[in-house]
Amino acid sequence: MVRISMSISYLWGMVASLFLMMPAYSADVPASPSPAPIEARNSVFINQHPDQFNSWKATSEQSERHDALAEDPYMVILWAGYPFSRDYNKPRGHAYAITDVRETLRTGAPKTAEDGPLPMACWSCKSPDVARLIQQEGEEGYFKGKWARGGPEITNDLGCADCHDTASPDFAQGKPALTLSRPYAERAMEAIGKPFDSASRFGQQSMVCGQCHVEYYFSGKDKAVKFPWDNGTKVEDMEKYYDAISFSDWTNTLSRAPMLKAQHPEYETWSVGIHGKNNVTCIDCHMPKVKNADGKLYTDHKIGNPFDNYGETCTNCHTQDKAAMQAVVAERKTAIQELKLKAEEQLVHAHFEAKAAWDAGATEADMQPILIDIRHAQWRWDLAVASHGIHMHAPDEGLRMLGTSLSKSAEARTKLVRLLAQKGVTGEVKLPDISTKEKAQQAIGLNMQQINAEKQDFLNTVVPQWDEQARKAGRLN
């Protein structure tokens, strides 16, 4: 028994020694490799993808600015109290993404990194530097602070790394390597049942564009970007979402209505149109395959009007000639434009009549249902017109939204007539002269001379400092 006991003790000692001598494999397991740093300088990729790069650079030819407020002064009134009443140009080439966000009056004239009216989130659709900063700082870190904080960091125009995994072997081999470079966009796609990784090639093509060409808002204390898609992507779905969280972008200074400002909801409106339902993607129409000088096909990155490349876009599906198709589009555009102006006219009257009701002594309780009608009416109008191509993407949906906008405005104005009568106001509420952008801005109390002077000083003094800091840090070529 003693010998057996000693043998067992000896064996246990040997086992213990072996355990002590074994290497600590768990400590030596290599950590998951960190992702390669995002390269935001677009010109780095010119040798890998020369045709794509040069066609992307050609978006600088789309240089003309169109002043939407000068064309339609009603919008100044609809956005009274919001930066869009100062300045709103129609979109132009991607090559101007940084220039335009710096130069618009909407971003103000900050003097320091902590100054200015807008948050960091206002850079989010402008540059691959955004993806770089999110990778470096995390989303929480990126969204902290004012827009001016990003000035020296976000300097490269919307480009390669916004849509492509430029560090991947696939990209180096000439493949698209599409990616969602904005994590909040990836979460939004998952919320509507469209996870990017399991989407088809066609689905991914539109999702990549849908990182920016969407409705979004700034959420929480850090004003982080979020898409309001929890209930769906139709105008009523997003309205329900916003109402449930009592969100408003601003308060109209005339009517005091809590307003929503639609951004550029092309993904949502395209999805419900004939092209979206048939999975004809943004790329099919706006970035067709074309041939280079050697006859090799490549994707044209000069994003533009499909009619500019009619033979490579529309004729893949349509048999009509170009003139016939242009006539169809023009007819739809005219129908949208006519209803748009009718909706705006009713909304403008509603805002001024609401102001008259407040001035006559109306109470919060009197006004609450009226202001909700105005909010809902303008939201429908704005979602329709902020999607610049809705006459092509989803004309029926555009007309439907504008029609419901008119209905909501009519409800608001009917209630206002009754309320004004109760307050002793029985005559028509006269509008001031708002026949031009300048007169409309004056009517809502904007000092445009001061606003423009402050902006020019910012462009002359602050912006050059941003660029110099970026060059010294190697963020610009």
UniProtKB/Swiss-Prot annotation:
Known catalytic reactions: 6 Fe(III)-[cytochrome c] + NH4(+) + 2 H2O = 6 Fe(II)-[cytochrome c] + nitrite + 8 H(+)
Positions bound to heme c 5: H275, C314, C317, H318
Annotated substrate binding sites: Y216, H264
Please list the residues that bind heme: C122, C125, K126
Keywords, A to Z?
Answer: Calcium, Electron transport, Heme, Iron, Metal-binding, Oxidoreductase, Periplasm, Signal, Transport
Q: Which InterPro entries match?
A: Cyt_c552, Cyt_c_NO2Rdtase_formate-dep, Multihaem_cyt_sf
Q: Does the keyword tRNA-binding apply?
A: no
Q: Which Pfam families match?
A: Cytochrom_C552
Q: Where are the transmembrane segments?
A: none
The EC number of this protein is 1.7.2.2
Q: Give me the comment on cofactor binding.
A: Binds 1 Ca(2+) ion per monomer. Binds 5 heme c groups covalently per monomer.
Name the source's superkingdom: Bacteria
Q: Report residues binding heme c 3.
A: H94, C209, C212, H213
- Gene Ontology process terms (BP): anaerobic electron transport chain; nitrate assimilation
Q: Which pathway is it part of?
A: Nitrogen metabolism; nitrate reduction (assimilation)
What does it do? Catalyzes the reduction of nitrite to ammonia, consuming six electrons in the process.
Q: What protein name applies here?
A: Cytochrome c-552
